[in-house]
Every structure is written in C-alpha cells, then in structure tokens.
C-alpha cells in the first residue's frame, strides 16, 4: 500500500492495523509533517512492515506538481510488488472479499485498474448519498507488469496510473471507506483550504485550478442526505472533533495566505473560517 500524508498521525495510528486487512507492506510519502508522522513511521517499520518512508522536497503547501510526488511514491512500491493499493490517510478498504481473494484477482487480471465504491461515512453506520456521493467510484487498487507514467497534474492527481485496462468491484464485496465527512467543521476547513490553495497557486504560479464552485458543490451547504449502511465504521466517529482545528496546518495556511495575498471571502459556508485575520 502507498499513502501520501501530512500531519495526520492521529489517523495513521488508528489506520495501520485496519490497513493490514488487505496490505502486506507499506510505502509512505511524508509531505513535510510537523506532528511526528515521519518519526513514528520509522519507529514502527518492523511492526507494520513499512518498507520505506519517503519525504517531499517542497514545503508541502501544494506548490509542487503532485503527479511527480505520486510517481516517486509509486516507483518505490513498484520495486517490491506490481499489486498496489493507494489510499489517503482518511480511507481504508472494507468488505467481504479477503486479502487472498483480492490478491488472486489481481494476479489473474494483470495490468488492470480496479474502481471501488467510495463510501462516505458521516457516523458509525450512516453514509452520505446526496448528489455525486450516491454512486462514486475511485481508483485505489491496481496491478502492473510494467512501470506506468502518471498523467501530469499540479494538484488533485490520479491516485494510480492507468495500466490500460480497468474493472469495477461493487459493495459489499469491496469498498473504500472515506472519513472526510465525519465532522462538519473539519470538512469546512479542509474544503476552504483547497479553495485558498487554488487561489494562491493560480495567482502566484498561473496553474490551472479547480473553481471554488466545485468545492461548493461538494459541500452542498451541508444539506446532506443519508442512509444506513451495513458495515460499521472501524474508526471512532468522533476522531476529528477531538482535534484542535485551529492548530491544524490547513487552518494556519488559510489564515496566513488570506493576509499575504489579500484573498476575498471565497464562501466559507457561514462557518467563519475566513473571518478576521
């Protein structure tokens, strides 16, 4: 499994045992964490079979080309296996399929990218299903016989390069559990962080960026629809609400750059994130 992370040690500590359900070994890209992530991963290499902990050269504020970083992460893992899972720190795989069944499927379907349902948890057994979140599939598992190239992207890069063929796995067989929506204040800060990051990258570097309206569509002004889900969340649903948001690097980045670039309110959904700087 490969994972890029920054200042998410509180998640990684909980995720490592869960990730082992489907992954035998791990390669991490530590994007300039200041919360001890890199040190913790190094200290627990033997316990979790972490084969490499790479580090980004950039300052970590999304000013580097993300696809280049993901390529380096992928290449390190490809030295060890052609069967690769790529998950963010707030994601894990779950379902009825066993590790052995998944491995057999990958071995029998070389050079195939598997799209899995992206399940948006909002509580222990409640998931978000409004708009694009009702039927959403993501690229998190693939097999490779030769080294592929990522499509170039400054930000929001594909997680895995396309090997030429693809397939779809459906829940409850296998799915991606996504924790992003568990805590609404955390959601607002994360999405507003991307708005500010895009603003800075476009103003400073001329990058093509995602328009703010795309984040508004994702947040949907917090007017969400829910359904019950058969698989209980394997993480404490309050994990985000227990963190100090104002001490997060995303919140600090927002405040610093609003002042530095005189950024207008990009619509913070009335959550007073933009506020007084």
Language-model-derived ranges and their functions:
Residues 1-3, 19, 25-29, 176:
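Hydrophobic targeting segments
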Residues 9, 35-36:
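Acidic phosphotransfer microenvironment of two-component signaling modules
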Residues 7-22:
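Short, well-formed alpha-helical segments that are part of the catalytic scaffolds
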Residues 2, 38-86:
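Active-site-proximal specificity loops/subdomain of glycosyltransferases
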Residues 63-74, 82, 92-277:
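Catalytic-site signature of metal-activated, phosphate-bearing donor transferases
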Residues 24-35, 53-56, 89:
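Short beta-strand/loop segment that forms part of the nucleotide-sugar
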Residues 14-18, 40, 100-101:
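A short acidic, amphipathic alpha-helical/loop segment
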């Amino acid at each position: 499994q490969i994972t890029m992370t920054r200042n998410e040690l509180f998640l990684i500590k909980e995720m490592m045992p869960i990730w082992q359900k489907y992954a035998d070994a791990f390669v991490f890209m530590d994007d300039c964490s200041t919360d001890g992530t890199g040190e913790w991963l190094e200290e627990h290499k033997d316990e979790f079979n972490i084969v490499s902990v790479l580090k980004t050269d950039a300052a970590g504020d999304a000013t580097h080309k993300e696809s280049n970083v993901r390529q380096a992460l992928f290449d390190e893992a490809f030295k060890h296996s052609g069967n690769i899972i790529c998950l963010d720190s707030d994601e894990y795989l779950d379902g009825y399929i066993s590790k052995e069944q998944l491995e057999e499927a990958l071995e029998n379907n070389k050079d195939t990218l598997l799209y899995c349902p992206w399940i948006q948890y909002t509580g222990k057994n409640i998931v978000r299903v409004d708009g694009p979140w009702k039927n959403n599939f993501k690229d998190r598992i693939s097999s490779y016989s030769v080294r592929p190239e990522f499509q170039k992207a400054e930000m929001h890069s594909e997680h895995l390069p396309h090997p030429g063929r693809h397939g779809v796995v459906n829940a409850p067989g296998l799915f991606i559990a996504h924790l992003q929506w568990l805590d609404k204040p955390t959601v607002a800060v994360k999405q507003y962080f991307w708005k500010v990051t895009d603003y800075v990258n476009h103003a400073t570097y001329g990058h093509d960026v995602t328009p703010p309206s795309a984040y508004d569509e994702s947040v949907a002004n917090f007017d969400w629809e829910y359904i019950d889900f058969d698989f209980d969340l394997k993480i404490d649903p309050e994990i985000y609400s227990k963190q100090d948001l104002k001490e997060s690097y995303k919140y600090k980045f927002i405040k610093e750059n609003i002042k530095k670039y005189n950024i207008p309110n990009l619509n913070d959904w009335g959550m007073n994130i933009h506020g007084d700087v």
